[in-house]
Amino acid sequence: MKILILGSGVIGVTSAWYLVQQGHEVTVIDRQGSAAEETSAANAGQISPGYATPWGAPGIPLKAIKWMFQRHAPLAIRPDGSLFQLRWMWQMLRNCDASHYAINKSRMVRLAEYSRDCIKQLRADTGIQYEGRQRGTLQLFRTNKQFDNAVNDIAVLEQEGVPYNLLTADKLATVEPALAHAAHKLTGGLQLPNDETGDCQLFTKELVKMAEAAGVTFLFNKQVKQLLVEGHRIIGVQCEDGVMTADNYVVAMGAYSTELLKGLVKIPVYPLKGYSLTMPIVDAERAPVSTALDETYKIAITRFDNRIRVGGMAEVVGFNLNLLKARHETLKMVVQDLYPGGGDITQTHFWTGLRPMTPDGTPIVGPTEYHNLYLNTGHGTLGWTMACGSSQLLADIISGKKPAIASDDLSVFRYVNGFNTKLVPFSHQLHTELRG
């Protein structure tokens, strides 16, 4: 089949890769001049299935109020009066209870664990290089309450069969030696030894080369205007320079997917703004070994070959890409507090991007009510973690194969009866009938 993918971030490019591997004729279009130039450009770099956690969690509403008065708050909300923003925040609020949190985290971990297996296989099959490390990740706790609350996440990890190590403060340096000096500031940590790290942009650009060699066509500097519809089918994509057609269409445009699909498919995907700093390593012994995640500030510090990436935070501010000095200061403060002298803080690249976030934290992967339109979006802060698994899953669905993991509760149909997180059954048999 001829398939047109809209978007060339890590989600769009991995979608292209897995689809061409199944014999499809694939074209990818993007408004940028090359792949991975927006949300995939400078994320935190962690591939962390066990830390796949929804932002909508018990206690978040109260914490959000407290964070409003903190200088280094991990979450900032700036109301703009739009119905889009208000509706999304209300939907997220409805997920901030224990039962919804457990359902959402279980879904996310399931997909993220599968995705980690997929990237391992991809690495074995292709030898792709992206400054990746397989040294695990370490969540750091600064309070006893954070340490005690880890038991809730551990229950989900055990349910999903994810290996973990709960460490007291004096044991943290056995995993991250450079943290020896900071043990007195921390109460402990949760290590996930099977997690990975790597440069998402580098991975995506390398995979573009491999996908092109396999037959995928990439068309850049191509602005998508709208989807053309006839009945329950998409008949083309209107671009600035003409119409493109295919048998099937995949929307992988991150936070911009919502506007493109307006009036066709209603998806609750909102742009959650995040920031990162990247700096050269000046003392390897003072730098992280892999990724350390500061639970208090929701900031990840990741080691690449010769660089440190510090990323995190979330702002509910719409499509705003202004770089705020205060956020730069927060990122700098955290890395200097935990890994002083590891990187050159005077030579940093400051970046911001918009993560496509759903209120329940779970991405939207799979078919729609339009027979030949598929979605791969809404991965939030976990696009890098979930990319390969989501795209392998989507390729199997489009090809009529049974996915390796349960996928019904990942599709847009979970929102059919208004916003909720209850499973709306959508069988593969019904999907086949819709495609017919």
UniProtKB/Swiss-Prot annotation:
Known pathway: Amino-acid degradation; D-alanine degradation; NH(3) and pyruvate from D-alanine: step 1/1
Cofactor(s) demanded: FAD
Gene Ontology biological-process entries: D-alanine catabolic process
Swiss-Prot/TrEMBL keywords: FAD, Flavoprotein, Oxidoreductase
Amino-acid positions noted as binding FAD in the UniProt annotation, renumbered to this chain: 3-17
GO molecular function term, any single one: D-amino-acid dehydrogenase activity
Highest taxon listed in the record's lineage: Bacteria
PANTHER family reported in the protein's UniProt record: D-AMINO ACID DEHYDROGENASE, SARCOSINE DEHYDROGENASE-RELATED
UniProt similarity note: Belongs to the DadA oxidoreductase family.
Chain's role: Oxidative deamination of D-amino acids.
NCBIfam families (alphabetical): PRK00711.1
Name of the molecule in the record: D-amino acid dehydrogenase
Organism: Photorhabdus laumondii subsp. laumondii (strain DSM 15139 / CIP 105565 / TT01) (Photorhabdus luminescens subsp. laumondii)
